A protein has these predicted regions:
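Bacterial Sec-exported substrate-binding components of ABC uptake systems
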Residues: 19-64, 166-194, 255, 261-267, ...
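Extracytoplasmic/secreted envelope proteins and their assembly/folding machinery
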Residues: 46-49, 56-63, 106, 124-127, ...
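Short, solvent-exposed loop/turn elements at domain surfaces
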Residues: 39-43, 60-65, 80-85, 199-205, ...
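Structured C-terminal subdomain patch of bacterial secreted/periplasmic proteins
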Residues: 31, 149, 160, 186, ...
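A short, structured surface patch at a secondary-structure boundary
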Residues: 51-108
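Binding-cleft/active-site segments that stabilize strongly anionic ligands or cofactors
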Residues: 85-143, 178, 190, 196-197, ...
């Protein structure tokens, strides 16, 4: 009899615990994201989804950083080196091939039966079609807000779906310290944000992939003085005469040719084109202050908004700027 009572008490305790857990674990959570009309605001999404479909590299970056990669059941083709474990072609069938970040394979998305689908701006037109399959989380970088703040907001939106907000706060506390170290090097300096592509140089607006240099680090982007930018992310063609006249203290060059693979198809390297006889007459060249983002070009071009991408970008800036600053200080002494 005592054994029966003990067993009944144990079962009751278990049921009470399960009930309490159910009461404290919500079925849905409200996050800040974009809706089908591209309006940023509150969106209700599933809490703790188990099956995740990802059609955006920045979102995949964040999901991986939060240790949630084992829940990814489908992904767009991956071109970012540190995310290749999620490449459908290399996953031995564990991850469905959902197409690309620009074009989703709707049939495959439906087949993998996701609880939630993450997309970026390139797939905004497919929001309604994807939403018919599963709830959609549409996140994008707001460059006017600043890439760091925007990345934090997006990472926190994803983290709050899984109860991992503290992980995001820890990451960004470390990022803030690194930015504080970099900021005095270029703050108030006249810089030129630019993009190299297929043997030509374009000027980049501040609200572009390179915005961290102007917005968060306080540099003055001379490119903004040249004209209006209809498509900031694509830049505007420039002439060497314009660059000579602007005479920047620093040049930052995002290498799109390398990011897209064109550099492997006979296109000249960025340095070969940019470091011509005219540019070599400028102090920015003589002082070694032309900074090329080549090694992680695809991160700068396609993954802005990911926390690991931000770590990579800060690493590139540290590697380029801190040695230059140390050299300049030594020369001044």
């Amino acid at each position: 009899m005592k054994k029966l009572v003990s067993l009944l008490l144990a079962v009751m305790c278990l049921l009470t615990a399960v009930s309490a857990f159910a009461e404290t674990t919500p079925a849905t959570v409200t996050i800040n994201a974009y809706n089908a009309e591209k309006v940023y605001g509150e969106v209700e999404v599933p809490y703790d989804p188990q099956r995740i479909a990802v059609l955006d590299m920045a979102a995949l970056d964040i999901i991986d950083a939060l240790g949630l990669g084992d829940r990814v059941v489908g992904s767009a083709k991956v071109t970012i080196e540190y995310l290749t474990d999620y490449n459908p072609d290399d996953s031995e069938g564990k991850i469905a091939n959902l197409g690309s970040v620009k074009t989703a394979d709707m049939e495959q998305v439906a087949i993998c039966e996701p609880d939630v689908i993450f997309i970026g701006g390139r797939l905004s037109k497919s929001y309604a079609d994807l939403e018919a399959i599963a709830p959609v989380v549409y996140l994008a970088v707001d460059y006017e807000k600043g890439v760091v703040q925007s990345t934090y907001d997006n990472a926190m939106a994803i983290a709050s779906m899984f109860g991992k907000e503290a992980d995001v706060d820890a990451l960004f506390t470390e990022f803030a310290g690194r930015i504080d170290t970099l900021k005095p090097i270029v703050e108030g300096k006249n810089v030129l944000l630019s993009m190299y592509n297929n043997n030509a140089l374009s000027l980049m607006a501040t609200n572009s992939q390179l915005s961290i240099i102007a917005n968060e680090m306080g540099a003055f982007n001379l490119s903004d003085t040249v004209g209006e930018y209809e498509k900031p992310a694509h830049g505007e063609d420039s002439s060497w005469e314009t660059i000579i006249n602007l005479n920047p203290e620093y040049m930052f060059v995002m290498d799109r040719s390398t990011a897209t693979g064109a550099a492997d198809e006979g296109v000249l390297g960025a340095r070969e084109v940019i470091e011509n006889d005219l540019v070599k007459e400028l102090d920015v060249y003589k002082n070694g202050q032309i900074v090329y983002f080549i090694e992680h070009a695809n991160v700068w071009y396609t993954s802005t908004g990911g926390v690991q991408a931000l770590d990579c970008m800060l690493g590139d800036l540290e590697g380029a700027l801190i040695p230059v600053e140390a050299t300049a200080e030594a020369a001044a002494e």
